[in-house]
Regions:
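Intrinsic disorder/low-complexity signal
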Residues: 115-120
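Amphipathic protein-protein interaction modules
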Residues: 44-100, 105-110, 114
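Negatively charged, low-complexity tracts enriched in Asp/Glu with abundant Ser/Thr
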Residues: 1-43
């Protein structure tokens, strides 16, 4: 199964893309994703996309044109690590949202609650 793109930004086209399949996300979350992606591409260059893999994990994918002297590959890796730390709660929430609404997974806590109510 192919990865599902959540959003992305391009330093070349100066554009932000948001997958409308995720339109049910709160506006403040969409705005935060836009700011995060656009600032990344303005800082490092290239193209950044956030994609869900088949297990529901959010992946940061980067690419750059070969002729892009401005693109900083080392800076890119560091910036992604920083974003993954700074935005940890947001990213984990997005993964949970995807797993529940797109993959049909029920979180362990919910299963435990259901099991507890059955036993009562």
């Amino acid at each position: 199964q192919d990865n599902i793109t959540l959003c992305g930004a391009s330093a070349y086209e100066k554009k932000f893309y948001f997958n409308q399949d995720f339109n049910a996300l709160p506006d403040h979350v969409k705005k935060e994703l836009q700011i995060m992606c656009v600032l990344y591409t303005e800082d490092v260059g290239g193209i950044l996309t956030l994609e869900f893999d088949e297990n529901g994990r959010l992946q940061f994918k980067t690419e750059a044109l070969e002729a892009d002297a401005r693109y900083d590959e080392i800076g890119s890796g560091l910036k992604i690590k920083q974003l993954q730390q700074d935005k940890k709660e947001l990213l984990e929430s997005l993964e949970m949202y995807y797993k529940v609404f797109f993959l049909g997974d029920i979180p362990d806590e919910e299963l435990k609650k259901k099991a507890d109510t059955v036993e009562d």
